[in-house]
């Protein structure tokens, strides 16, 4: 069975969906999950990327031992479109998907996960998409097909609006309340209870 593989590779986890094309329509036939990725230049970045792709693909192939991935598209956190980093990631995907003797892989595309998400949600025309997770990025497209990105600098530099950043700022507010630097508020107990903490010592 000749398969198409689509990957959503974020910093927390990676998903793989396999499909076959029948009468011009993609029919999903399997899904798998693996660990997250980090920037390729980060310590162990390439190893993590390889592991994320290979693990999620093998999980998705469990029910299709004779399946051969013919083409793969990866939307990955931290990949800039049109850069040497993109080419490097595409070579790594080829390595990760060299499964068995008959690899069959003829086409690989790796790009930023914001681009695959925008095309998946809004294939044509104007639109805008925001991703808020470990990091944050926004991608917009106008009526002429021109795209513009905002954010995507990484959580250490600028994670404004990311789920991590919002949670971090909320936790910081509760610490100021505990210190008396801010008036106490029910939000402090709500956040601490969600964390399973019943005192300032437990927060540490």
Where in the sequence are the language-model features?
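Short, intrinsically disordered, charge-balanced linker/junction segments flanking boundaries
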Residues: 198-204
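Short beta-strand-loop/turn "lid" adjacent to the catalytic site in phosphate-handling enzymes
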Residues: 38-41, 57-97, 109-110, 119-122
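Short glycine-rich, Thr/Ser-proximal phosphate-binding strand/loop in the N-terminal lobe
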Residues: 3-48, 67-68, 146-148, 152-153
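Short beta-strand scaffold segments in enzyme catalytic cores
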Residues: 14-20, 119, 130, 136-141
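Conserved phosphate-binding catalytic cores of ATP/NTP-utilizing and phosphoryl-transfer enzymes
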Residues: 94, 99-129, 146
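Glycine-rich phosphate-binding loop plus the immediately following alpha-helix
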Residues: 146-197
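A glycine- and small-aliphatic-rich helix-loop capping segment at beta-alpha/alpha-beta transitions
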Residues: 20-26, 88-96, 124-128, 143-148
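Short glycine-aspartate micro-motif
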Residues: 4-8, 69-73, 109, 127-131, ...
């Amino acid at each position: 069975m000749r398969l198409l593989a689509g990957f959503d590779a974020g910093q927390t986890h990676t998903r793989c969906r396999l499909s076959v094309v029948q009468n011009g329509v993609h029919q999903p036939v399997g899904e798998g999950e693996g660990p997250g990725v980090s920037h390729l230049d980060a310590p162990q970045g390439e190893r993590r990327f390889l592991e994320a792709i290979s693990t999620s693909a093998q999980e998705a192939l469990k029910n299709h031992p004779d399946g051969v991935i013919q083409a793969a598209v990866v939307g990955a956190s931290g990949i800039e479109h049109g850069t040497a980093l993109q080419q490097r990631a595409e070579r790594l995907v080829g390595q990760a998907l060299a499964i068995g003797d008959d690899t069959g892989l003829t086409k690989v595309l790796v790009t930023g996960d914001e681009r695959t998400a925008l095309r998946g949600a809004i294939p044509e025309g104007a639109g805008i998409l925001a991703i808020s997770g470990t990091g944050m990025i926004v991608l917009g497209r106008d009526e002429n097909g021109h795209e513009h990105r905002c954010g995507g600098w990484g959580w250490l530099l600028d994670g404004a609006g990311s789920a991590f950043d919002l949670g971090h700022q909320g936790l910081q507010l509760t610490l100021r309340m505990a210190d008396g630097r801010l008036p106490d508020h029910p939000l402090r107990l709500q956040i601490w209870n969600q964390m399973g903490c019943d005192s300032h010592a437990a927060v540490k």
